Amino acid sequence: MKRSILLAIIAFLQFFTSYGQYDWDNVPIPANAGAGKTWKLQTAASDDFNYTFNPTNNVVDFGPNGNMKWYNKYHNRPNGQPNNFEGPGPTKWMQNHVAVSGGNLNIWASRIPGATKSFTGSNNTPISRPETRAGCITNKTRVKYPVFVEARVKVMNSTLASDIWLLSPDDTQEIDIMECYGGPGNDNRNSYFASKIHLSHHVFIRPPNFKDYQPADLNSWWGKNGVTQWGGKTIRIGVNWVSPTRLEYFVDGQMVRILDNDAVQTRLADGTWQYTYPAGVTSTGVNGQLIKENGYQKMNIASSLSDAKNKSNISVIDPFNYLNNGRKFSKEMDIIINVEDQSWQAEAYRSPNAAEMANFYDNNLLVDWIRVYKPVNASAANSAETTSTVEKPASFEPQGQPTEKLQVYPVPATDVLNISQSDYVEARVYNLKGWVMLRKDVIDQKIDVSSLKKGIYILEITKATGETVKQKIVISE
């Protein structure tokens, strides 16, 4: 009997050691791995920063227990040689502005009185501003689609940029996971941008014929009702790089934006979805220009993402074919985390002033963890690195009948459930024990249920207003 108990304890400890080792273990993955797929953690690229790394003036690798995951500078060139780019605008990246302590990555900014840096302004005129010294790190493991990258971050209460991004080694393809200017400034000069998170990407033609495209639609500056500034808030933010032409953005576990080849779906500040596509461009060649309205890219509104895609013939990834590869993200990318004093902010005199820079805590970016997953076949999911999205059991009793106008079909379903009304935005599927087996956004009035096994479940669908409806569904093979 004692031997059995001892073996059980050993087995439990082995399980706990294998499966309870990361800070994010109890945080469900919000993105969909795809039909027949599950998520597998990429341990080399992921980090929960539960170790100590002290600032140094030297370029060094660092990570937990000798497992070197990062180097403390901007990413290297494709040939592995150092990249001497110091940073945008008045930014000067410094190795000694990076540390790991207290369970967080710390990247901060500072100034040296009298130090300035010159850069070229928007009208090709030279501009000089106080030099902002800041930290920058690069992951030693590159990523490529399909991949989900998510971080838990305390956004700086600063007009400086809190950044997590992906960049190809040749600097031509960029996906911005988070670009946030979270502080309004002591005179509220940055209040508009402080209330937004910029969900964007870039494609470039590099010098001598430099060109830079990024989405310029109003919805790329994402906001949420009740949030007047992101600075000082701790958020989860991630991107699911699904394919060369599809990006899905998540904030605090909720999908908020999709770029799908030639159309866009964005969750507005009130929680409702808006579906848009470009109203036009002057040309789809390299010399083309966006059609703008009130300073932003002019977009047409559609009734659904599929409707927008059917009506659009202009890429939202690379409308001017800068990449010359079929208008798609095709290259593996480096994961970069840094702080920046960006040129357009500095030119507009929205950089932190001396008094604001004196507050170290407002200008220190904290990253609790960053995790990276790739989808694998569910049948092959048998290692400790494989993670499903099943949540802890809920206290649940089926309740509330759907209104007569609402229909959920087919019955039984195999791969997709259709919902007859368009105002439902989120769905959860429970088994009869009350466990959440599936959690997804409702897209185009459809729910992908292909990952569910045969059986009877309870579907709970929620409107943007918070109103919910629950009913039984049947899944067949």
From Swiss-Prot:
GO biological process: carbohydrate metabolic process
Gene3D superfamilies with a match to the protein in the record: 2.60.120.200
GO cellular component term of the entry, any: extracellular region
Family statement: Belongs to the glycosyl hydrolase 16 family.
Signal peptide positions on this chain: 1-20
SS bond partners: none
Domain called GH16: residue spans: 22-378
Annotated compartments: Secreted
Protein name per UniProt: Beta-agarase D
Main location: secreted
Designated gene of the protein: agaD
Pfam family, one: Por_Secre_tail
Active-site residue list: 174 (nucleophile), 179 (proton donor)
One function term, GO molecular function aspect: beta-agarase activity
Catalysed transformations (reactions): Hydrolysis of (1->4)-beta-D-galactosidic linkages in agarose, giving the tetramer as the predominant product
